[in-house]
């Protein structure tokens, strides 16, 4: 007799690092390998919309999303700002991983890190490679200061062809990074979106994500205050540490196979810097993929290609 598949679709609250934190777990068969997804930001979790983009991924993996400490459904006014450090997030990630492995009776899992989450992933992989089969680095952050400078130059080049445009005016107004004022950062991110190199390459896709967050069961309007408060809280206490990160010096080697995925149009984390890190990284195996129709969120913008890419390079169980 062929055993029946046992699907799963749950929200699970855990006590992680002495704070309540929320997981969302989905898959068609709990016997499939686990995939833990570390969201970007800091402070921009995906639980509110991501289920719309991972149906194919759930055929191959039991997919776990986690609203990290101080963000989204894991936000609380009681969380100490002293705990909002990369080191605490690394410990949280390891604790979440160990709970998942014990709960599902697995020895290892697959780890995906997107943007800010890719910083956490590199540190976790460096400390506990024994817990993971393969790492999927999506829009891999390497050196935020260099990435910002590179993106700014790309935007200036685009704006030069449109000298009378609002883009040209704004890039000249803020000048080159580093920027000291919040308004300069806000204008810069607006310029990134104008050039279609931001969250998604197609603005319609970003609007769809917002609609899904507002109308979905996971967040909805009732929980948007937690999302927004968590976003402000996370950025306030983690941004300085984020900008000090340099993967070239901090994580020159990883002891697990690595697959890097970058969007061709990404101007938040330009592909050339991620690819330079990929080329210099010491790892037992590594692959590089560029998604031609994506900006910063290839797993959302091209979900079928993303699912196929991950499943093809999951060497264990699939």
From Swiss-Prot:
Molecular-function GO terms, alphabetical: aminopeptidase activity; hydrolase activity
Protein EC: 3.4.11.-
Keywords: Aminopeptidase, Hydrolase, Protease
InterPro entries associated with the record: AB_hydrolase_fold, AB_hydrolase_sf, Hydrolase_4, Peptidase_S33
Disulfide bonds: none
Residue numbers annotated as active site: 115, 266, 296
The protein's enzyme class: hydrolase
Cited function: Probable aminopeptidase.
Full protein name: Probable aminopeptidase YbaC
Lineage: Bacteria, Bacillati, Bacillota, Bacilli, Bacillales
């Amino acid at each position: 007799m062929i055993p029946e598949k046992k699907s799963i679709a749950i929200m699970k609250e855990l006590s992680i690092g002495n704070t309540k934190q929320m997981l969302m777990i989905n898959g068609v068969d709990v016997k499939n390998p686990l995939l833990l997804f570390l969201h970007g930001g800091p402070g921009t979790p995906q639980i509110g919309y991501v289920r719309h983009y991972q149906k194919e991924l759930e055929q191959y993996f039991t997919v776990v999303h986690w609203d990290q400490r101080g963000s989204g459904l894991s936000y609380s006014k009681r969380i100490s700002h002293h705990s909002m450090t990369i080191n605490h997030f690394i410990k949280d990630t390891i604790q979440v991983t160990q709970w998942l492995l014990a709960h599902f009776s697995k020895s290892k899992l697959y780890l995906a890190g997107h943007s800010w989450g890719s910083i956490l992933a590199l540190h976790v992989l460096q400390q506990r490679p024994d817990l993971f089969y393969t790492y999927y680095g999506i829009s891999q952050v390497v050196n935020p200061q260099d990435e910002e400078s590179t993106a700014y130059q790309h935007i200036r080049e685009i704006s030069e062809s449109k000298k009378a445009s609002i883009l040209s005016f704004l890039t000249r107004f803020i000048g080159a990074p580093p920027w000291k004022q919040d308004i300069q950062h806000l204008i810069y991110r607006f310029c990134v979106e104008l050039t279609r190199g931001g969250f998604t390459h197609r603005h319609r896709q970003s609007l769809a994500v917002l609609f899904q967050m507002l109308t979905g069961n996971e967040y909805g309007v009732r929980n948007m205050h937690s999302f927004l408060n968590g976003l402000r809280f996370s950025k306030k206490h983690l941004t300085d540490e984020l900008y000090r990160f340099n993967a070239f010096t901090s994580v020159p080697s990883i002891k697990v196979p690595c697959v890097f995925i970058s969007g061709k149009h990404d101007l938040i984390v330009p592909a050339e810097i991620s690819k330079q890190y990929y080329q210099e990284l010491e790892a037992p195996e590594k692959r590089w993929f560029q998604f031609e129709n994506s900006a910063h969120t290839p797993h959302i913008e091209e979900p079928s290609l993303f699912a196929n890419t991950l499943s093809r390079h999951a060497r264990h169980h699939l």
